[in-house]
Amino acid sequence: MKEFWQTCVSRLEQELPPQQISAWIRPLVPLAYDEAQAVLRVAAPNRFKLDWVRKNFSHQIEALAAEWYQRPVQVTFELPGTSSAPRIPMAVPRPVAVSVPAVVAAVQQASEPAPPAPASADAANIVYERSRLNTDLTFENFVTGKANQLARAAALQVAENPGTSYNPLFLYGGVGLGKTHLIHAIGNAMVAAGTGVRVRYVHADQYVSDVVKAYQRKAFDDFKRYYHSLDLLLIDDIQFFSGKNRTQEEFFYAFEAMVAQRKQIIITSDTYPKELSGIDSRLISRFDSGLTVAIEPPELEMRVAILLRKAESEGVPMPEEVAFFIAKHLRSNVRELEGALRKVLAYARFHGRDVLTVDVCKEALKDLLSVSNGQITVENIQKTVADFYKIKVADMYSKRRPANIALPRQVAMYLAKELTQKSLPEIGDLFGGRDHTTVLHAVRKISDARAKQAELNHTLHVLEQTLKG
């Protein structure tokens, strides 16, 4: 039984996304296999997970069990301690090789996120039924501070009144600031409310893939039927729609259909809607019609709170001075903080350090600290701005002048003048040998634009906070 379950989980790991494995498969506990009746009993930790697994994964598990036990097997799901039947001794099956093609076919039937060949509404629903929500991302474990309190308040309002308050809700900000956490929290809150809502979380890249496969299989009717029937659609990183005209067209139709039915749409992006490049103006107009909220890099107190909460979830006591030390030196985003904490915990375990101290942190993070302790340099500004605008650092020095390069270059020159002691000629030299008058023009242009354009002012604020901490 143990050997079978390990094989079952291993096989599902090859076919399902990691978040589905951690959210739905790993919490399951195999109880017993009744060899006489060919019944496999499996326990789920709560009613919500039980119903979800029974609906979405039972046939995969049955297919794997049938291959293993070499006979049709019925899988029953129950809550711990609810069965009046005695525990059945685990039969020791004859280990056999699991037939990969049969299992893969069964798993793909339920896990393939793209539309199948057109058949019926039921066939489309089998493919699309799963929400792909990460149940670990909730409002309860979302750390709130000045940087994200408005976004969290808006998210709570949407979760309580979907389709009526702020539709669409557009969240934007840099990498690792909690946008994905918030939209999963909204979905989980709506599912937990028990209203039977149809929810779908999808990264923009996956949506593009769905459109391509629907086009290849001539399955757009099934595709539209599914997406237009949702109660809540969560689209992550919509900037990846850039230049994908067919995808944008299909999303526009889905957007219009859902909003007309007062169904909720939530979108995340790394930039303000009007700054999205390669996106149809009709979509940008729709994005602006709802509520747009920025999430900024966390301030010091929030970074400390994030570290303390994460350490608590790992079951590791962390003195506040240790959290403060890490937060003081690592400033950019939540993901960086969590990565640093994992590094500290791994270092402490490897070296047998039972208590976390500042000295342990200094040793574990010496490579990161050597970088973060340095003064702000023009080179650091160029890299940070290039990363933000998704261009190459080399574009900062090049003679090319397209708009998608000229603006970031001028922003970097402006920040170099504001945040370093370099003279205009020195800054010009570091930007490919440009004349000091070019730098002065860029500084004046960005300074004037900042006073007039809220979006640019926000971008500069984020970049300054990232660079200064």
UniProtKB/Swiss-Prot annotation:
Residues 349-469 are annotated as: Domain IV, binds dsDNA. ATP binds at residues 176, 178-180. Residues 71-131 are annotated as: Domain II. PANTHER family: CHROMOSOMAL REPLICATION INITIATOR PROTEIN DNAA. Transmembrane segments: none annotated. Oligomerizes as a right-handed, spiral filament on DNA at oriC. NCBIfam families: DnaA. It is found in: Cytoplasm. Keywords: ATP-binding, Cytoplasm, DNA replication, DNA-binding, Lipid-binding, Nucleotide-binding. This is Chromosomal replication initiator protein DnaA. One of its GO terms (biological process) is regulation of DNA replication. GO terms for cellular component: cytoplasm; plasma membrane. Its main location: cytoplasm. Plays an essential role in the initiation and regulation of chromosomal replication. ATP-DnaA binds to the origin of replication (oriC) to initiate formation of the DNA replication initiation complex once per cell cycle. Binds the DnaA box (a 9 base pair repeat at the origin) and separates the double-stranded (ds)DNA. Forms a right-handed helical filament on oriC DNA; dsDNA binds to the exterior of the filament while single-stranded (ss)DNA is stabiized in the filament's interior. The keyword Nucleotide-binding applies. Residues 1-71 are annotated as: Domain I, interacts with DnaA modulators. Residues 132-348 are annotated as: Domain III, AAA+ region. Domain I is involved in oligomerization and binding regulators, domain II is flexibile and of varying length in different bacteria, domain III forms the AAA+ region, while domain IV binds dsDNA. Pfam families: Bac_DnaA, Bac_DnaA_C, DnaA_N. Belongs to the DnaA family. GO terms for molecular function: ATP binding; ATP hydrolysis activity; DNA replication origin binding; lipid binding.
